[in-house]
Regions:
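Active-site microenvironments in enzyme catalytic cores
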Residues: 1-123
Length: 123
């Protein structure tokens, strides 16, 4: 039903930390037994997805889109990002809200930024 029910992701700038920082295991609702009500416990199934982060340099006016052909002119550089997920909490909260609290507790980011200029020879 993902075509008909909007899914919201929730994140905070304050949850972005440098890779290597200790991550506190999140707590949330979990319902492992369908016969019992959900319980509020620490996550038991924690993982992360490796992603590519982009640093935007040149800005644009608020509310003004950037044409796809001009997008690269606005990118300063890239870095590796780990998007952490509390999968057991996510399984419970996913419908109808989407992965809200299960994905908002931590994002780790590489301390290194590779500029687009440095990547040019590898295009």
């Amino acid at each position: 039903n993902y075509k008909y029910i909007p899914i919201g992701y929730h994140g905070r700038a304050s949850s972005i930390v440098i890779s290597g920082t200790d991550i506190k295991r999140p707590r949330g609702q979990n319902r492992s037994d369908a016969e019992k009500p959900p319980v509020f416990i620490p996550c038991k199934n924690l993982d992360y997805e490796m992603e590519l982060g982009f640093f935007v340099g040149k800005g644009n006016e608020l509310g003004q889109p950037i044409d796809i052909k001009d997008a690269e002119d606005h990118i300063f550089g890239v870095c590796l990002v780990n998007d952490w997920s509390a999968r057991d909490i996510q399984a419970w909260e996913y419908q109808p809200l989407g992965p809200f609290l299960s994905k908002s507790f931590a994002t780790t980011i590489s301390p290194y930024v590779v500029t687009m200029e440095a990547l040019a020879p590898f295009r």
